[in-house]
Amino acid sequence: SWEWWHDARLYGVDFRSGYNMDSYKYYIDFASKFGIPYIIMDEGWAKSTRDPYTPNPTINLAELIQYGKERNVKIVLWLTWLAVENNFDLFKTFADWGVAGVKIDFMDRSDQWMVNYYERVAKEAAKHKLFVDFHGSFKPAGLERKYPNVLSYEGVLGMEQGGNCRPANSIYLPFMRNAVGPMDFTPGSMLSAQPEDNRSTRANAMGSGTRAYQMALFVVFESGLQMLADNPVYYYRERPCTEFISSVPVTWDETKVLYAKVGEAVVVARRKGDKWFIGGITNNEGRTINLDLSFLPAGQSFTLTSFEDGINADRQAMDYKQRESKVNNATQL
């Protein structure tokens, strides 16, 4: 769960929302209810972006870490790269505090010094059993293979860019950006809009594309750390959608591409254990794609729960239809 995208603007609650104790406990409670293992405390948790040791006066970090621990939810802290560089002993300190990982931001360059910085960070974080999410980063080049505690990188025009993030561009990402490594796209908008209707602001963050499209992104895009970027108030309201996206794994045992045409559409099937997840996205143009489920094990029947664009999704992007059906390896969809 991530508060920055919607500026921690909770509502319908009996406390003043923002970057404060009551709000973060609300995020922890939400994450716990849906089995989400982490919350990210983004820019605003610290008194100064230069000081990684002093929370802002509204935050008792030790209390929040303990509150989360009691509910099986761990905390990830956002930092600027320079604060990390100037306080490189913070990894030990954060580990001692019980922090799970760090989200490091604003590198915004890829010269040799910065490339070396990434590895120094990954190595030091691994030494103290912390994971790393590189935000404001260049695209990955394999560092996560040597340091598997590097879970994701931004390096993409993702949902943080509001209305500028459109399906017509994002359809290329599975073929290009995500092909070279994990991608912190931050999907999950419940306030979905067709691109021409997107009026996203920090107060009312919106995602372009239909509701079903937003849900499919969790399957199509790979990231070792996925965000539920939207307001928990919306997620509570849209429980079937939330239950699905919070159930999608972030690591996979098997992946099959069922359909792919660059710039037009892609459909992938991914397996974790004995469960299969299928996700498909387009460039926002409607199309019919026939899917062959012959990859399923022979002699077994599966219950398919699907989330599909509703009949009016082209006019109101939040329109979707949920249905269940029995399928097997002879089924054609």
Regions found by a protein language model. Name each.
Residues E324-L333:
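C-terminal beta-strand-rich structural cap/linker in extracellular carbohydrate-active enzymes
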Residues F295-I311:
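Solvent-exposed beta-hairpin/edge-strand motifs
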Residues M41-T210:
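Aromatic- and carboxylate-enriched substrate-binding clefts and catalytic-loop regions
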Residues V262-Q300:
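Carbohydrate-binding surface patches
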Residues L130-G136, M159, G163, M227-Y236, ...:
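Acidic/polar loop patches that form or flank catalytic/metal-binding clefts of enzymes
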Residues P195-F221, Q226, R271-W276, I281-R287:
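Long hydrophobic segments that form regular secondary structure
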Residues D230-F277, D314-M318:
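Glycan-recognition and catalytic regions of carbohydrate-active enzymes
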Residues S1-E70:
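Conserved structural scaffold segments of CAZyme catalytic domains across common CAZy folds
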